Amino acid sequence: MKILLLGSGELGKEFAIAAQRIGQTIIAVDNYPNAPAMQVAHQFEVINMLDGSELDRIVAKHQPDFIVPEIEAIRTERFYEYEKQGITVVPSAKAANFTMNRKAIRDLAAKELGLKTANYRYATSAEELQKGVQAVGMPCVVKPLMSSSGKGQSTIKTVEDIEKAWNYAVEGSRGDVVEVIVEAFVKFNSEITLLTVAQNNNPTLFCAPIGHRQERGDYQESWQPARISDKDLHEAQDMARKVTEALGGAGLFGVEFFLTNDGVYFSELSPRPHDTGMVTLAGTQNFNEFELHLRAILSLPIFDITLEKAGARAVILASENSNNPTYSGIENIACLPKSDFRIFGKPTSRPYRRMGVVLTNDTLETPIEEIVTRAKKMATLVKVNL
């Protein structure tokens, strides 16, 4: 099968590797050359994916069997036409359109499906944001409707923060939508990602919950399994099943939840492998998240997903701008037991850009806090150089 991969970052790279292993053809697409997934693809294209005519051109050129989006900044409205042409959009044109924009997915979850979410409003200007803040109360969280990896996300604690939050959200927005969501701050005990695998002809499956920590709106560490009560887990699985069934199609979804004293709150959803799910590369499961996504897309039956080890991953961050980043200290990771790493191969670096991850695992009986601490220490051993 021929797969057109729209977005060629580190998640796309791991997906492309998984696809290569079972004989699939990958055409990797992004808006800059030598993106990570392009380095392991059969062919690549460099285009502005928000340009519908450019998308049409490469779809007509390559005639893919599948279109797999990896990022948000895509002219997803074109996907409906590609489905009419007989191309499978992953997980579906509807899912891709709804989840590329926080407004559509939040309204689906809260208004149509009745899932428990934080109180929220939308704003298209700093003045509207001020009204939204008054409606939901402070503290509150502001996010662009279209963004990734926490870009443009901030917390408003005082009235003086509103204009700054608006400007930061606009700067961090992807695509051409200048609108934000402002939501009441949920007093949560922890956050989890529930990797949810929707299959074409088989039941929906769930991975063991993944815990994660954010800083500057970006994921720093994730671990599996996360601690959660049976009651909260069943509630999260029920919500994840409802929202993925409403979106339709097959593939892996990363569904995020807040765990609170008041139960489980739906937060966000990504219709593709999730940043936090890279912990599955530590060998925590019988299939990692990229293999699960691929198998679901290709309608290869997945009998079950088993948790085999406890694991954690932590990011390797750049500290400076470079057009030719190099790495030191990798040998310090290589000599450690139960440990591994990935260098993404990004051609340039900038402060706080994720350049790789470290991975570690242990037995299911090992306290997860010990494994997370180990991963955090490992990440400090690798330096990104100019």
UniProtKB/Swiss-Prot annotation:
Listed GO MF terms: ATP binding; magnesium ion binding; phosphoribosylglycinamide formyltransferase 2 activity; phosphoribosylglycinamide formyltransferase activity
ATP-grasp domain segment(s): 107-298
One cellular-component annotation, GO: cytosol
Matches recorded under Pfam families: ATP-grasp, PurT_C, RS_preATP-grasp-like
Reactions mediated catalytically: N(1)-(5-phospho-beta-D-ribosyl)glycinamide + formate + ATP = N(2)-formyl-N(1)-(5-phospho-beta-D-ribosyl)glycinamide + ADP + phosphate + H(+)
GO annotation (BP), single: 'de novo' IMP biosynthetic process
Subunit and partners: Homodimer.
Descriptive protein name: Formate-dependent phosphoribosylglycinamide formyltransferase
Source organism of the structure: Flavobacterium psychrophilum (strain ATCC 49511 / DSM 21280 / CIP 103535 / JIP02/86)
Gene (UniProt): purT
